[in-house]
């Protein structure tokens, strides 16, 4: 996998700026046809995408097929459908509101749902008439190269989509600070998001940040614990817990604490854990040693805190 540098970002931005004038003026109907073809191509290569991401991220193949390959194609189809009714011009009183493409969009995406996150950014930008410079996660980049092949095969004009692989401190930083980029869309940690926002501020870019967090699962006293506790465990363990909305903190009434622990422990014991390429598995490996160490630290912290 190429380890990009700032000069690679310069070339990608130059290509995106060159392509922007023509792409932004391309009729909506033509842009929509490209999105439809992209959706069809994503579906045609869904098995390959699912296997690739199962290998990169560790999500079991059954879930990878449904989520990691299914969501990107579905989202691309949604963007294509939106162009049927989206109003790029709207009359309000005696004023005309015109919605124009913002320009060159820098997209920096995470590793947990890699292609899904890429399509959420790239699909919308293409539909709006923007050109893109994408930096996928360096931990799970292969799916982005499949998308680049698909984009090439459907004939998207040169320079409309540009892929620069590499790490965040080098490629991500170059994208967020580049004067030729008009907007940055970032999904990842709060720490990195602060750096992206600070870098983008110098050139007054538009910035969209989706940052990490924790999700409380509140179970009330009158709930059916036998039904909801296992579902909470499932929601916590999906994608090995590597989900921004994973229900990692189950809060139950103190009077039913022991009951909840017993049901949760039984649900965990019944969770199939093995090679993610095997059918029927629910829990695969974590994506990296660093992530494994982080999870172990949280487990130990929980034990230490009682």
Regions found by a protein language model. Give the residues of each.
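ALDH superfamily catalytic-core signature
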Residues: 191-306
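N-terminal glycine-rich, Lys/His-bearing helix-loop that initiates the first secondary-structure elements
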Residues: 1
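Generic non-transmembrane alpha-helical segments
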Residues: 37-48, 146, 150-156, 229-230, ...
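Glycine-rich phosphate-binding segment of PLP-dependent enzymes
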Residues: 10-25, 48-59, 82-83
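Residue-level signal for inorganic ion chemistry
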Residues: 31, 53, 76, 129, ...
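Long amphipathic alpha-helix in the N-terminal Rossmann-like dinucleotide-binding domain
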Residues: 14, 36-47, 61-86
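Short linear capping/connector segments at secondary-structure termini
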Residues: 52-60, 90-94, 212, 278-284
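Rossmann-like NAD(P) dinucleotide-binding subdomain of oxidoreductase/dehydrogenase enzymes
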Residues: 88-227
């Amino acid at each position: 996998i190429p380890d990009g540098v700032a000069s690679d970002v310069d070339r990608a931005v130059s290509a995106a700026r060159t392509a922007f004038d023509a792409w932004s003026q391309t009729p909506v109907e033509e842009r929509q046809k490209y999105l439809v073809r992209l959706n069809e191509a994503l579906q045609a290569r869904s098995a390959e995408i699912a296997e690739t991401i199962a290998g990169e991220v560790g999500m079991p193949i059954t879930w990878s097929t449904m989520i990691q390959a299914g969501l990107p194609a579905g989202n691309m189809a949604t963007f294509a459908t939106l162009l049927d009714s989206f109003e790029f011009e709207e009359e309000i009183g005696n004023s005309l509101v015109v919605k124009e493409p913002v320009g060159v969009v820098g997209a920096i995406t995470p590793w947990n749902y890699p292609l899904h996150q890429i399509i959420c950014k790239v699909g919308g930008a293409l539909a709006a008439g923007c050109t893109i410079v994408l930096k996928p996660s360096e931990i799970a980049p292969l799916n982005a190269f499949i998308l680049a092949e698909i984009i090439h095969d459907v004939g998207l004009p040169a320079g409309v989509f540009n892929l620069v692989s590499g790490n965040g401190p080098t490629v991500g930083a170059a994208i967020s600070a580049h004067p030729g980029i008009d907007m940055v869309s970032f999904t990842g940690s709060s720490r990195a998001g602060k750096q992206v926002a600070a870098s983008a501020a110098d050139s007054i870019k538009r910035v969209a940040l989706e940052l990490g967090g924790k999700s409380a699962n509140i179970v009330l006293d009158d709930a059916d614990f036998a039904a909801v506790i296992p579902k909470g465990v499932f929601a916590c363990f999906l994608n090995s817990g590597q989900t921004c909305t994973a229900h990692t903190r189950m809060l139950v009434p103190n009077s039913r604490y022991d009951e909840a622990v017993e049901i949760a422990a039984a649900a965990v014991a019944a969770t199939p854990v093995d090679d993610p390429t095997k059918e029927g598995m629910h829990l695969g490996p974590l994506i990296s040693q660093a992530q494994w160490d982080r999870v172990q630290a949280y487990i130990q912290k929980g034990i230490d805190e009682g």
